[in-house]
Amino acid sequence: MQKEDLQCIQNHPGQRAAGTRLTLIMTRDDRSRTLETFIQTLEDHWPALIVERTRADDDGPPLLSLGDGLGFQGLPENTKLSPFLDILAGEVPRPPEEHRAILNRMALGEELRLYVAAHCPHCPKAFRQWAALALAGPNLRVRVVDGSLFPEEAAREGVQAVPTLVMNGDWRWSGNIPVNDVLRQLADRDPSQLSAAALEGLVKEGRASKLADAMQAHGSIFPAFIDLLTHAKW
């Protein structure tokens, strides 16, 4: 860990806030050890932090879970560290009423992926903004992906600049991301068109009952749910 990052941790006003928690989800991916080393250092200098460690038996990427609907896939260092620590300490701004109203209209939300990178001057603002929305909206899920540590994922999704927000692998917004447009598109979309990957994410996060309610309200089983049930993995 860089000296500047260590000082940022030691000087953060929320360092001793009670009830500060995060979950480290490790996998067979070698980068799990990189995240584990960072978290161990963070624990050593953040006395009130409680870390739950779990291990997923797959080759997927390791993840830091910061609360319902919000995950950080990468190393929260450099420009990413300050917003990460603010979120840990519960210092998250309340989204505007207009945004909260749209969040409340969402039935099921597909996971948005926000790509950031070290030394990106505009990434901290996007990180804070979308973290606040994910934590405020029970049906909005955001995964912040460190493109520096996971370049293969950024390349696969055609990310050429940061910050970039990706929805459903097709829609993407870079730079100054239009929050209203993205939220409205999520709220107004047909939930029956969610992908199998999105439905799997809901089930893994303990939201199977919400998925069942959505299908009941729709009056039919979502096509991708059949694909999920018949997948060889299950």
Language model segments and positions:
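Structural micro-motif
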Residues: 56-70, 151-168
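Thiol-based oxidoreductase modules, predominantly thioredoxin-like and allied folds used
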Residues: 47-58, 138-153
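Extended repeat-based scaffolds of very large eukaryotic assembly and lipid-transport proteins
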Residues: 179, 184-234
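N-terminal leader/targeting and pre-domain segments
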Residues: 1-19, 75-108, 191-197
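Catalytic cores of nucleotide-enabled group-transfer and carboxylate-activating enzymes in metabolic
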Residues: 13, 19, 62, 91-94, ...
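Local sequence-structure signature of Cys/Sec-based thiol-disulfide redox active-site neighborhoods
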Residues: 2-40, 103-140, 223
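N-terminal non-catalytic structural scaffold regions of very large proteins
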Residues: 31-79, 93
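Non-catalytic, surface beta->alpha helical segment in thiol-disulfide oxidoreductase systems
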Residues: 65-94, 166-200
